[in-house]
Amino acid sequence: MDAQSYLKRIVYRGSVRPSIDVLRRLHVRHLLSVPFENLDIHLGRPIILDQELFYNKIVRDRRGGYCYELNGCFAWLLRELGFRVSMLSARVAGKNGGFSPDFDHMTLLVRLEEPWLVDVGFGDSFTEPKLLDSTRPQLDSGELYRIARKNRETVLSRWDEIGVWAPLYSFTLRPRKLEDFKARNRYQQTSPKSHFTKRRLISKLTPNGRVTLTDRKIILTNGEQRSESPVRNSKQFDGLLTKYFHLSFE
């Protein structure tokens, strides 16, 4: 495992001395370079919680992954560069107003002069680290985010188009180890109730928007413009996978 190869993978150049400016740039470059994807689950390849395996997949094979892989690997890079990083357990907000079980999502806490929420593994979410500050909303790529304490947890929310704070996930600040996520990682890739087993998904931030591909459709956003087109068969899916993500499994 080599930090310089990782930096090359995310096309990062410049200082790596721990600071909020460097953290912001690393975060954005990671999102622009490494997709969120669950393709291994549908290829019958088990996802094992091991940082060297994450590194090989993301850096050497130029793939992506889901939260445990992406944030687990990014945590390794940040520590190699001298950042103080903790893995946190998060519970994803559901449509019914509740939250999923513990360890359903992994997010990161980076401590500089102030504590920052870092997450390169939650798909379409914030692009820059968020200050753990419950007193004011934080603007990010035209979206407002808020981090607020609720009982014993902290909740990340986004200002919705209907004019309410919509929770994304809740988390505690207790540091966790990679193996703590083992049971939930197994569930995510094997349970028929897991949304990761229901369909293939790959999504990546672009300089002006996002590209998202599933078994059923491809969605392209560019600024205020959004287009959605059906995916009719596996051959078309494979072609789009190569065109937009430079991946092929032939």
Where are these regions (language model features)?
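Residues at alpha-helix termini
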Residues: 9, 80, 243-244
